[in-house]
Amino acid sequence: MPKKKEDSQKTLSEKEAKGLIAKLSDEIRHHQYLYYVKNDPKISDFDFDQLFRRLQDLEEEFPQFKDLASPTLVVGSDLDKDFEKFQHKLPVLSLINTYNDNELLEWVNKTDPEGLYSVEWKIDGASIVLYYENGILKNGVTRGSGGIGDDVTDNIRTIRNIPLRLPEPITVYLRGEVFMTFKDFEEFNALSSGKYANPRNLSAGSIKQKNSSDTAKRPLRIFTYDATFPNMEKKFKTHQEIFSKLEKLTFPVPPNTAFVSGSKIAKTIQEFKKQKDSLGFPTDGLVIKLNDISKRDALGYTSHSPRWARAYKFDAIMKESKIVDITYAVGRTGKITPRAEIEPISLAGTTVTFATLHNQDYIDELGVGIGAIVRVAKRGEIIPAVEEVVTPGKEVFKIPDRCPSCNTQTIKKESLVDLFCPNPDCPDRVKNGIIFYCQRKQMDIEGLGDKQIEFLYDHDYIKSIADLYDLKDQKEKLMEEEGFGEKSVNIILKGIEQSKQKDFRFLLPSLGLSELGHKVTELLIEHGIDSIDEILSIAKDQKKIESLLEIPGIGPSTIQAFQENFSDKRILKLIERLKKAGLKMKADPIQVADQQPFAGQSWCVTGSFENFQPRDKAMDLIVYYGGRKVSAVSSKTTHLLAGPGAGSKLEKANELGVSVYDEKQFLDLLKSLKIDFKNLI
């Protein structure tokens, strides 16, 4: 009989864990410095991800040893003190990596199996963002932290195939990758006594040269692969249209980009793989993107990456092993995830004893069973994955149709391949929900790691998130438990008490409600939906619920989840208990400096203007003086600045009674406020 989930870290003593956390922290900081600052990485992305995830897991398991300066609290950046800093106009996100066809196709089937996708070369170079205004290259900026980058414009201007002036006076922001061809790299490296390791490192270092004349001597090139046109009234419907526009604007794009249906992606990947070794430029994989822009908008983003794209990485490291057992775990959402326990193997310097099997469809497709000899690949996860079956076991493993934790009949949700336990009282679901709530990125309750929460649940101290706030009533009893001395109990209770001061913008996503993560929470707050009372009011009104679709980044799936979440009596009871416990149920106001005339106002800007070209300059001015930017007119919008071509936004504003200003009225307003806008734009 398969066993329940076991914690692979339980064999570590606290002393061993403390030492390992310190060692991993130092090692990761060293590699972050080499990668982001020196552009001289010494280990692969695989190995770095493994170290990072290992440290994250240990810190969650032993939170008492987490360091306030832990590298897991800091996002890596290539910012350099020698360059001016530039605030990106849009978040510069990364992509989620996949390492095999099965994983990618699982995402395709979940996203849009019949849709059209682009398949592009993933260039192995240095990421750059180009900003053009009225057809002129204004800024070239490194990705940096994703929000702020280094302005390396002078160096970027020296790259031969970057157009400095476009054939149209258009404003456009582009993502691109700076690289060198193998031929150019070999020739340049020969002249430099062979001191450069590879084209990628040389490209990254070249755009960070302090003297642009040195950059000009290096044979750099660029491919652009995505763009935003902020002022175009006619929006693009597909990524293919954007690609065509880039080519018309004389931007170089990755060659041989294919646009294929979801059913043809696997075949297309094989065709690309046949070409990769004969390419003249460095690539480390492919990028697969959903073609339909409206579908992208509906899917939206996480805080780190778009949901509508994936990176497909080449050449995962693989080794053979034997499956000893197959276990399965129940997550907080009820999802049941099987994993193979394998004979220990060494992959990229780490000992691997478990490998994920994803779901029953994946198991069936590969024909995985206990006793099988399989190939295991190192991936971007802490637990690698079974990729191939070399020698089958006696029979293909079947996940039991009942939850391993509570014995409830499992179900399949619409359009998903995973099995789920539907029982909200399932012990493993509840425990993992509490663990999620307490994690560092959520409510960050010190002293409560996985082990402590499992103990408290199993010994009837807590049975829900709300029970944490009654734990103080059992302090004396808890201190008598093994491993819970007075000091550790005081740390736990202090952490619980301090969590009451966490902003509502942390509380709401920490509840683990479907589709209500940090990104959606921020979108709601930005649009004035900043309290639980406001949310519950909307949940009772169908028209108000539908109006949420006006918020960019919120799609139909989020709306459906919103309705389901806030009509669930269990969730409503939890919210009520947390209210009574004293947690914050309204977002803290953003502090605005004195003399901010637009403070408390929400402005939308549309149309064209004589004094504000591009029109973003008007919005930047409003934000500078305390206003809030909104991209669509809704009942929460207080003002609309409308120029010629305003269209439907002006009609909507008039319907809702929003204050409308034309350009002359806006200039008069600025004059009355004694704002000299010409010195600011």
Curated annotation (Swiss-Prot):
BP GO annotations: DNA repair; DNA replication
Cofactor(s) essential for the protein: Mg(2+); Mn(2+)
GO cellular component, one term: cytosol
Binding-site residues for Zn(2+), renumbered to this chain: 403, 406, 421, 426
Active-site positions on this chain: 122
Gene Ontology MF term list: DNA ligase (NAD+) activity; metal ion binding
EC assignment: 6.5.1.2
Catalytically driven reaction(s): NAD(+) + (deoxyribonucleotide)n-3'-hydroxyl + 5'-phospho-(deoxyribonucleotide)m = (deoxyribonucleotide)n+m + AMP + beta-nicotinamide D-nucleotide
All residue ranges annotated as the BRCT domain in the record: 593-681
NAD listed as a keyword: yes
Key words of the record: DNA damage, DNA repair, DNA replication, Ligase, Magnesium, Manganese, Metal-binding, NAD, Zinc
Chain positions recorded as NAD(+) binding sites: 45-49, 94-95, 120, 143, 177, 289, 313
Entries under HAMAP family matching the protein: DNA_ligase_A
Chain's role: DNA ligase that catalyzes the formation of phosphodiester linkages between 5'-phosphoryl and 3'-hydroxyl groups in double-stranded DNA using NAD as a coenzyme and as the energy source for the reaction. It is essential for DNA replication and repair of damaged DNA.
Family statement drawn from the similarity comment of this UniProt entry: Belongs to the NAD-dependent DNA ligase family. LigA subfamily.
PANTHER family: CHROMOSOME TRANSMISSION FIDELITY FACTOR 18 (PTHR23389), DNA LIGASE (PTHR23389:SF9)
Protein name (record): DNA ligase
Organism from which the protein derives: Leptospira interrogans serogroup Icterohaemorrhagiae serovar copenhageni (strain Fiocruz L1-130)
UniProt lineage: Bacteria, Pseudomonadati, Spirochaetota, Spirochaetia, Leptospirales
Gene name tied to this protein: ligA
